[in-house]
Each structure stands twice: as C-alpha cells, then as structure tokens.
C-alpha cells in the first residue's frame, strides 16, 4: 500500500495519527530550517512540514512523493479555512521521491491563464488543474445520476455497434476500411438510431446507453467530430411519456449544482418559436420578442420594406449608441450573410431618427413605436426579405441585444420544449446549411428520416410535404438545444413513403436500410425516444463556454488533436493491408457476399 489516507480526507480527528500519503508537489515555501509543501492528490491538498533542508531543496513542482508523518494541529493563526484540511498539517518523518518532473510548460494553477493550444497539447497536465478536473468529475456524476434514474425506471443499458454500414443520416460518415473485405468499408455511427429502433423490435421495451457518436462535418464553432449522447428509446410510449422522462432527467442532473428545475417545462410550437424569437432554440431568460411588421408596411413606399416579410426587434436604450456602434451592427449583420441591419432611433423627445426614418410616411412614423412596443430612448432594428433568413437575423440580433444590454441574467435557467416542427425542408436549404440530404429528392427530413408525422398528416405528408408536421420534440436550455427526439415510424409502408419522397427508390432504400425495413415486417411496436447532447448538458452544468472543457481529450478546430497530432498519414504498408487503394471491378451485391460467407 503506497498510502493510508487520501490527502483531502485528513481532518482534526486524525491529529496524532501516523499516516502515509502520496501525491504531487504544489506550492513550496522555505521558511529557513523548515519548509512547507502543498501536497496534492485527486481528493485535495494537505500541508506537509519538512524539517530536513536537504530533502526540501531536492524537491520541485509536480514531483511525485510518498510521505510518512504525523498529523498535527496547525499553530494558532495559521489555519486555512479555504481548505478542508486547513486545520491540520503533517510533520514529515520520511519523504520518498516516486518520480521527478521536468519544468512545466505552464503552471498547475487555475488562477493562471493558459492558451488553449498549450492546454490541449499537454492535456494530461491541464487535467491536474482544479477547474478541468472538477468538470470531468461533474460529468462522471451526471452519468451516474442518469444511469440511476433510468435503471429505477426499468431501462436496460445496451451497447450498440460502433462499426456498422454507411447509412445516410444527415451528415457525412467517418469511414473505416475493412481489411478482410477489400473495397468495402465500415462507417462509424452518427447515432445509435437504427439499432435502438431494432432493439424495440427485439422486445427491449426500455433501452438506453451513453453512446459515442461520430459525424464528419465541416468545421462549426464548438462542435466535435466525436461526441456523446445519452440515448433513450422505449416502446408503447407517446410524446408526453418521453417528455415526462426527459424532464425527470433534467431535474435530476441539475440537482447536482443545487438547482431545482420546475416541471412541467413549458412547450412552444416550432412556428411560435420562429415567429416570436427567430430561432428554434429560443433563449427565454429575457423578453424582447420579434414583431412582424409585414402587414404594417403593406402599403409602404420604402423599397426595402416591400418584401415578403418585414420584422423588428427593440434594443432598450439603444438610441444613445454612437454612430460607430451602429456601423458595427452593420458589420455584425454582414458576417451573418445579410446586407445590413436597418434601424430607427426613437429619441427621448419622441422623434424618430436614422437613415430609415426619413423614408417612412407620417402614418408609419406615428404608429411604429406602438407597433413594436418601443419606448423613448430605444433603437428599433429591422430585417426585410424572405421570412426564414430575416427571422434568423432578428433572432440573432435579439440574443446579441440581450447580452449587450444586460437583459440576460447568467444565473437564470430557462427551459422549453419546441414541438410540432416541420417534417421536411427543401433539400437545397439543408445542403446550404451544411447538412447532407439523405436522398436525391427535393425534400429531406428536418430531424431524420425515421421521425413519424403527426397523426393528422399520416395520409398526406408525401402529397403535401411542405405542410406536414412531425411528431418531434426538442428540449432547449438558455438558447442551447440540449436534446431532441421523436415518435418514430414503425410501419414499413410509411417508412418507404418517406424514403420515396426523399428521393430513395425501393432499390436504394433496400440497399441502405433493408435491415430496418425487414425488421418492420415482424410486428414492430409503436416506439419513440430522445437523445441528450451530453457534452452540452455537462458544459451548462459546469458553467463553461465550450464543450471542449468537459471532454477529457477533445479535438481543436477542424477536428485536429494537438495531443496525438491526429489525424495523421498512414504508412504504405498500412494502406496496402487496409485495402484503401483497392479498386474492385464491381462490388458484389449484399446477397452474393452473404452467400460466399456461408460457404
């Protein structure tokens, strides 16, 4: 046994006991003839008193020590109430250096700012710091709480494959060459979606796992190519059942940070969320809802406002902004693909000013403030054009206004469910936003191709896809989507109709999803589920800005790993063995390969 006690466990009741401890050297203080060492392990820090000068002078930061000594009360006035061990110290009798340390690339101190590149390159050192260590331990606790709750509810934890076939699910797959089948490839799963549905067919009525998922996406802010979901699926449930379970999980994990989340959590339709907040993940910690002005400006002479949609959002106190600040808003809008952000300043004296105001009629000027709920001293921002991008711009401006004006209390928690989302969107729009359309049709799924339509659209979704609403539900916290799910399609003919609408004919559907369609032939039960983005959930609990801060070994921008320098080239021998460059004359059908395997 290298130690008898954890450092952080020592208290006044241990005074007089001989203990053996192990840990890393933190701060060292030489007081002439006696030295004090802060020794640290995973449980905390304890002060070690070293009286042998020769021993002390040989120690350096982050040396690994084993110390045997006697627990003593600190001299009066030297207690440290900030430490759990602050009432005691250990008088060292024997000090053994278990390992030395080279000079550090940065200090193991949470009060010292360290660049992210250095932190990720030496992540094993970064994890010794209190903040990163605390985040990873919080993640472990969140895992435990979720598992305990789900086991109590009768859910079974089941691992699904991480080597599967490539199936279009809305993003690009990471592909893995199959050495024993040259020219064939596995794919890493974007989610356990198809397997968890087949588990329902298999009679596992309540399934969950903490699943690793992989998506080869273009770089987006705060995304990781590999990420974690708390993945859940159940048979014989409706939307209310799944939402109720999701709320119980949220309540349980938020209790880890002593926050009580009231339930039921409010529900907002997708249409309302977009109209009122310009986002399908609205931040409800503050108001400042959007106002549609299309009808208000229907007879306008101002060319900019002769548009399919005109909307506005109010910035309280914004009329006092300097010209430089107003110009900066234009640059802000251009970075989001807009031409600019029109505005009217509602002066304290009641006058309207700014470049837009002079283009308005007297009637429009007289009614504008009341129409948008502006007060003297406010600034009114406008967007005009196609409805979707205009609302998105105003929604982003709303959040920016909330931050700039202090309307958002960072200690608040505001949750909502967004329900009744469209089932389909134009495939071109999905591709433009960075997603991958599943088929070659004009329409693709908003959530995924396995989401059921709401019952009232079951007979018409493929005839009028633009109007069809899905049986989907997303949970949002402070403007972050932290989970999403749906009631699934469980009837083969309905699933085939969805595939056909999305441009997958029967042959394509059979090739890509035949195993799922086959399963649906044998009494698939009605089922539904939800998946929480676990990295995002834990980052919110930890109060950090990036999900990288709650992942033990995250990737940096573009999916690069500074620690291992992955991805990296492979050798010529590896390429040959893996069959990366293999060019088959013709890929044999699945049935032929199965027949050969049987032989």
From Swiss-Prot:
The protein's assembly and partners: Homodimer.
What biological processes does GO assign it? aspartyl-tRNA aminoacylation
Gene3D superfamilies assigned: Bira Bifunctional Protein, Domain 2, GAD-like domain, Nucleic acid-binding proteins
PROSITE patterns registered for this protein in UniProt: AA_TRNA_LIGASE_II (PS50862)
Q: Where does ATP bind?
A: 215-217, 224, 481, 533-536
- Can you state which reaction this protein catalyses? tRNA(Asx) + L-aspartate + ATP = L-aspartyl-tRNA(Asx) + AMP + diphosphate
Protein source organism? Pseudarthrobacter chlorophenolicus (strain ATCC 700700 / DSM 12829 / CIP 107037 / JCM 12360 / KCTC 9906 / NCIMB 13794 / A6)
Q: What class of enzyme is it?
A: ligase
Gene symbol of the encoding locus: aspS
This molecule's function is given as: Aspartyl-tRNA synthetase with relaxed tRNA specificity since it is able to aspartylate not only its cognate tRNA(Asp) but also tRNA(Asn). Reaction proceeds in two steps: L-aspartate is first activated by ATP to form Asp-AMP and then transferred to the acceptor end of tRNA(Asp/Asn).
The entry assigns this protein to a family as follows: Belongs to the class-II aminoacyl-tRNA synthetase family. Type 1 subfamily.
Which residues are annotated as site, described as Important for tRNA non-discrimination?
A: 31, 77
SUPFAM superfamilies in UniProt: Class II aaRS and biotin synthetases (SSF55681), GAD domain-like (SSF55261), Nucleic acid-binding proteins (SSF50249)
Looking at the UniProt record for this protein, which Gene Ontology cellular component terms does it annotate, in alphabetical order?
A: cytoplasm
Q: Which residues bind L-aspartate?
A: 169, 215, 447, 488
Where in or outside the cell? Cytoplasm
Q: How is this protein named in the record?
A: Aspartate--tRNA(Asp/Asn) ligase
- Could you tell me the EC number(s) of this protein? 6.1.1.23
């Amino acid at each position: 046994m290298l130690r008898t006690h954890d450092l952080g466990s020592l208290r006044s009741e241990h005074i007089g006991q001989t203990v053996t401890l192990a840990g890393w050297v933190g701060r060292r203080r030489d007081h002439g003839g006696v030295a004090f060492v802060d020794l640290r392990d995973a449980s905390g820090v304890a002060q070690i008193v070293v009286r042998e000068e020769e021993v002390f002078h040989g120690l350096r930061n982050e040396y690994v020590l084993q110390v045997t000594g006697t627990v003593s009360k600190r001299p009066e006035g030297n207690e440290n109430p900030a430490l759990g061990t602050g009432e005691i110290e250990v008088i060292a009798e024997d000090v053994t250096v278990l390992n030395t340390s080279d000079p550090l690339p940065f200090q193991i101190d949470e009060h010292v700012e360290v660049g992210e590149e250095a932190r990720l390159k030496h992540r094993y050192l970064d994890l010794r710091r209190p903040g990163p260590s605390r985040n990873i331990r919080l993640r472990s606790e969140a895992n435990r709480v979720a598992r305990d709750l789900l086991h109590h509810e009768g859910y079974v934890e089941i691992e699904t494959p991480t080597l599967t076939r490539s199936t279009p699910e809305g993003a690009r797959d990471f592909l893995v060459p199959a050495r024993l089948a040259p020219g064939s490839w596995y794919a890493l799963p974007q989610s356990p979606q198809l397997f968890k549905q087949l588990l329902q067919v298999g009679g596992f009525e309540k399934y969950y796992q903490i699943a690793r998922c992989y998506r080869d996406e273009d770089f987006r802010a705060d995304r990781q190519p590999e990420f974690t979901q708390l993945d859940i699926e159940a048979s014989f449930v409706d939307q209310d059942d799944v939402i109720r379970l999701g709320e119980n999980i949220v309540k349980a994990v938020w209790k880890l940070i002593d926050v009580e989340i009231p339930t039921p959590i409010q529900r907002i339709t997708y249409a309302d969320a977009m109209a009122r907040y310009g986002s399908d993940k609205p931040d409800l910690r503050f108001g400042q809802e959007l106002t549609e002005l299309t009808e208000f400006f229907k007879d306008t002479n101002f060319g900019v406002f002769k548009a399919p949609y005109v909307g506005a959002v109010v910035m309280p106190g914004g009329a006092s902004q300097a010209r430089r600040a107003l110009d900066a808003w234009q640059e802000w809008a251009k970075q989001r693909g807009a031409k600019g952000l029109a505005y009217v300043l509602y002066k304290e004296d009641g006058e309207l000013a700014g470049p837009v105001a002079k283009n308005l009629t007297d009637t429009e000027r007289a009614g504008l403030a009341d129409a948008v709920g502006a007060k003297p001293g406010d600034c009114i921002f406008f967007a005009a054009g196609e409805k979707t991008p205009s609302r998105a711009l105003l929604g982003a401006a709303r959040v920016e206004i909330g931050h700039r004006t202090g309307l958002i209390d960072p200690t608040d928690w505001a949750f909502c469910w967004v329900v009744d989302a469209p089932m389909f969107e134009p495939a071109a729009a999905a591709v433009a936003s960075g997603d991958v359309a599943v088929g070659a049709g004009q329409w693709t799924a908003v959530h995924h191709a396995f989401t059921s339509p709401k019952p009232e659209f079951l007979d018409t979704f493929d005839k009028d896809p633009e109007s069809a609403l899905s049986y989907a539900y997303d949970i949002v916290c402070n403007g972050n989507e932290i989970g999403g799910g749906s009631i699934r399609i469980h009837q083969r003919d309905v699933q085939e109709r969805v595939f056909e609408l999305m441009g997958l004919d029967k042959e394509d559907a059979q090739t890509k999803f035949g195993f799922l369609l086959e399963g649906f032939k044998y009494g698939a039960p009605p089922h539904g589920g939800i998946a929480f983005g676990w990295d995002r959930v834990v980052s919110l609990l930890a109060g950090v800005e990036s999900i990288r801060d709650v992942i033990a070994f995250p990737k940096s921008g573009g999916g690069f790993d500074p620690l291992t320098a992955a991805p990296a080239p492979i050798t010529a021998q590896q390429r040959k063995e893996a069959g990366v460059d293999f060019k088959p004359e013709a890929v044999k059908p699945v049935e032929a390969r199965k027949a050969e395997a049987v032989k």
